[in-house]
UniProtKB/Swiss-Prot annotation:
The keyword Membrane does not apply. Residues 159-245, 315-398 form the Doublecortin domain. Gene3D superfamilies: Doublecortin domain (3.10.20.230), Transferase(Phosphotransferase) domain 1 (1.10.510.10). PROSITE patterns: DC, PROTEIN_KINASE_ATP, PROTEIN_KINASE_DOM, PROTEIN_KINASE_ST. Keywords: ATP-binding, Kinase, Nucleotide-binding, Phosphoprotein, Repeat, Serine/threonine-protein kinase, Transferase. Residues 479-737 form the Protein kinase domain. SUPFAM superfamilies: Doublecortin (DC) (SSF89837), Protein kinase-like (PK-like) (SSF56112). One of its GO terms (biological process) is intracellular signal transduction. It catalyses: L-seryl-[protein] + ATP = O-phospho-L-seryl-[protein] + ADP + H(+); L-threonyl-[protein] + ATP = O-phospho-L-threonyl-[protein] + ADP + H(+). It is an enzyme of class 2 (transferase). It comes from Drosophila yakuba (Fruit fly). ATP binds at I485, G486, D487, G488, N489, F490, A491, I492, V493, K508. This is Serine/threonine-protein kinase GE16371.
């Protein structure tokens, strides 16, 4: 606090005043001397009065600078009156006591303005004709301090709280001040946390719940404790008990000073962002999180971490666990989510290999070269030895036993990218699982075309067993009915046109009588589609539920489904396939971020928009009849045989990654015109055995002109083990999908 120079208020009196203070019973001075002293005091009083306005201006200026209330001029006058009465009570002659901004002889005093100062020094100067004497009166001024409250002191100290993202053990968290003044309601805190998390990580929705680190639900601001950490949950997610960012700085070391916000923002930006959020491309931060040290001095430095974005891509590596031979062989999927830094990769490896000695401290390639930086995991080597604190025998430990070599070769066989010669006839596409009705040209259709509109509608509906009067009135009055564009086991689809705008839509009529016992699938389809809003997912315009039928007005795509397009062109170029897999991957990423699995991804359920030359411009995912929300492992056996994942057939429980398997089958078909797993005469048992084995080929001549990049992507999407299979985000992160195929020469050799 700066020091303010406060001019002293001098009290001038004659020598008689001084003598009266020292000896109240002393004799009275001569009259002439008294008159002279009174004249001097009167002159001082006049000068002080003239400068009173300047004193008030100085006080007002000081009040504005300190931003705190000060005593008014009237209050100061009262104090001077008290002083005057105190001293004049002992005077026998008339004495004038004046208040001044400075003594006549130029004396002044300095008063500290700090909050700890509890005394105010007042200097009283008494002048006489022969000399002067100073009387200093010191009095405590606690009452003045009470009249000058510190407006900067908050009424309640804000709590220092750290929040994590539920289930995300790599997110460093965000620390914010929390108080009742800052957040008037719990919902306001939810809104602020949603905004902060969306800036740094991808979340499936708004923050709805807060848990403490033990999983107890927090229901009010009063339950939050200062210095503690909490977990934010979105869309009513259950609490996930994981080790939340063990390498982050302890909360006790964080401060809420003016530098705390830039620190938290910088730390939060270290975590890599997904390249696709709700179908829109977003940038990734070039920085990586420097996690907790491994104990052996991990060589991750700032200059290397800046290259993380360029080196990290989805990749499956093989791990050999240290121990007694033959050693255990495991696999691990590395991607931007679990590999933002070298230390994070070591943590991921530790959780997979589970060493007896604890944490993985050292990693070596198959040739015995030490892995010392993040980029080493994403180069040509894909097999690594994992060690803890035990000593390493370089002469023996890096030699593979026959059993170990066999296990590695089996793994590599499922990742095969080399072409083999196809023996026998070319495999064929499976039969389409639904019927498509082409336009009829017979005489009956011609008569129907020339009939009135209602008659044509009746003709179309009668062929499907639906009466025109059964159509909901709002659909019948708003749209005109067109041709049948497809049907399935439980539904039929018409092309309809809006009467006013002329825009085309699709009307899906679901027959409830054919869905006895499966009505929940219909309800789930409508419930899921109402939640969706993505450029590569068919939009639901209107739904009408009646006793016998469910009517869905859907977005219309002019090019038809992908199955028909494959039938016409047999195979697509890599550039066209890349467009379609990007759009499909974006749609799956959006679905999976909301915890929704489609369960029936196949060419028949993918609609395409074509240009005048037949090139695919856009792909949209449709038909959510089997879609559902995933809260735990699913066990229901469903889907289409050609595209079903092995975990569904094995009935061991499945989740979101069955959609990735189906997308891998589709990408394979796009490039060569037939699926990787086939059986003679489409027999299901041999087909299922082939799918469970996970072994397939890239046979020549159908794959001879197709690059290794897309083969690598397919191999990672068709992993039998869902734990190492690519996620939908990994599909989008793969260099072939991005279009950066220059990487493949050095980093994707098998």
């Amino acid at each position: 606090m700066e020091l303010d120079k406060v001019k002293t208020h001098s009290l001038h009196c004659n020598a008689a005043v001084l003598s009266s203070l020292q000896a109240p019973t002393s004799a009275t001075s001569p009259q002439s001397f008294t008159s002279k002293a009174n004249a001097v005091a009167e002159a001082a009083f006049i000068e002080n009065s003239n400068q009173q306005q300047n004193v008030q201006k100085d006080l007002n200026s000081h009040n504005r600078d300190c931003d705190s209330p000060v005593s008014s001029t009237s209050e100061l006058e009262k104090e001077f009156d008290d002083l005057r009465k105190l001293h004049t009570s002992s005077l026998t002659n008339s004495v004038v006591v004046g208040k001044s901004t400075g003594s006549l002889n130029g004396d002044y005093s300095i008063t500290s303005a700090t909050s700890k100062t509890k005394t105010l020094e007042s200097v009283v100067t008494i002048n006489s004709a022969t000399g002067s004497a100073c009387l200093t009166i010191a009095s405590t001024a606690d009452h003045i301090k009470k009249r000058i409250p510190n407006s900067r002191t908050p009424t309640r100290k804000a709590l220092r709280i750290k929040f994590y993202r539920n289930g995300d053990r790599f997110y460093p968290g965000v620390t914010i001040p929390v108080s009742n003044e800052r957040y008037r309601s719990f919902e306001r805190l939810f809104e602020d946390l949603t905004r902060l998390l969306e800036e740094n990580v991808k979340i499936p929705g708004a923050v709805r719940t807060i848990y403490n680190m033990c999983g107890k639900k927090i229901t009010s601001l009063d339950e939050l404790e200062d210095g503690q950490s909490y977990v934010c949950s979105c869309n009513n997610e259950n609490f996930k008990k994981v080790e939340y960012n063990p390498g982050s700085q302890p909360l006790s070391n964080l401060t809420l000073t003016n530098n705390s916000r830039p620190y938290n923002q910088r730390l939060a930006k270290h975590r890599p962002a997904s390249p696709l959020k709700n179908g829109l491309l977003v940038g990734s931060s070039p920085l990586a999180v420097c996690g907790g040290g491994t104990g052996n001095g991990s060589p991750l430095i700032a200059s290397k971490s800046s290259d993380r974005v360029t080196v990290v891509h989805p990749r499956i590596v093989t791990l050999i666990r240290s121990g007694t031979k033959p050693r255990r062989i495991m696999r691990l999927l590395l991607n931007k989510r679990n590999s933002p830094s070298f230390d994070h990769v070591l943590t991921a490896i530790t959780q997979v290999v589970r060493l007896d000695t604890g944490y993985v401290r050292k990693v070596f390639t198959l040739s015995g070269i030490s892995v010392v930086q993040l980029s080493d995991f994403f180069e040509s080597d894909d097999v690594f030895f994992a060690y803890g604190t035990e000593r390493i025998n370089t002469a023996e430990d890096f030699k593979l036993e026959p059993e170990e070599l066999k296990a590695i070769n089996v793994i590599r066989k499922t990742m095969r990218t080399a072409g083999t010669t196809c023996k026998g006839p070319k495999p064929k596409m499976p039969i389409k699982s639904k019927k498509v009705y082409p336009p009829s040209v017979n005489s009956e259709a011609f008569k129907a075309a020339t009939a009135p509109e209602d008659d044509r509608h009746a003709t179309l509906l009668t062929s499907t067993g639906i009466e025109i009067n059964e159509l909901p009135s709002n659909i019948r009055s708003t749209y005109t009915l067109g041709k049948i564009i497809g049907d399935g086991n439980f539904a039929i689809v018409f092309k309809i046109k809006h009467r006013q705008t002329g825009d085309s839509y699709a009307l899906k009529i679901i027959d409830k009588n054919k869905c006895k016992g499966k009505e929940h699938y219909i309800d789930a389809e409508v419930r899921v589609m109402k939640k969706l809003n993505h450029p590569h997912i068919i939009s639901l315009i209107l739904s009408v539920d009646q006793n016998t039928n469910m009517y869905l007005v859907l977005e219309y795509v002019s090019g038809g489904d992908l199955f028909d397009a494959i039938t016409q062109v047999t195979r697509f170029a890599e550039s066209q396939s890349r467009i379609m897999i990007r759009h499909l991957g974006a749609a799956m990423t959006y679905l999976h971020s909301m915890g929704i699995v489609h369960r029936d991804i196949k060419p028949e359920n993918l609609l395409v928009k074509l240009d005048e030359h037949g090139n695919v411009l856009e792909l949209k995912l449709a038909d959510f009849g089997l879609a559902c929300e995933v809260n735990d492992l699913l066990y229901a056996v469903c889907g289409t045989p050609t595209y079903v994942a092995p975990e569904i057939l094995l009935e061991v429980g499945y989740g979101l990654k069955i959609d990735v398997w189906a997308a891998g089958i589709i990408l394979y078909i796009l490039l060569c015109g037939f699926p990787p797993f086939v059986a003679p005469d489409n027999q299901q048992e041999p087909l299922f055995d082939a799918i469970i084995s996970g072994i397939y080929e890239f046979p020549d001549p159908y794959w001879s002109d197709i690059g290794d990049g897309v083969r690598d992507l397919i191999a990672n999407m068709l992993q039998s083990d869902p734990d190492v299979r690519f996620t939908s985000e990994d599909i989008l992160d793969h260099y072939w999908t991005i279009g950066n195929e220059g990487n493949e020469c050095t980093t994707y050799k098998r």
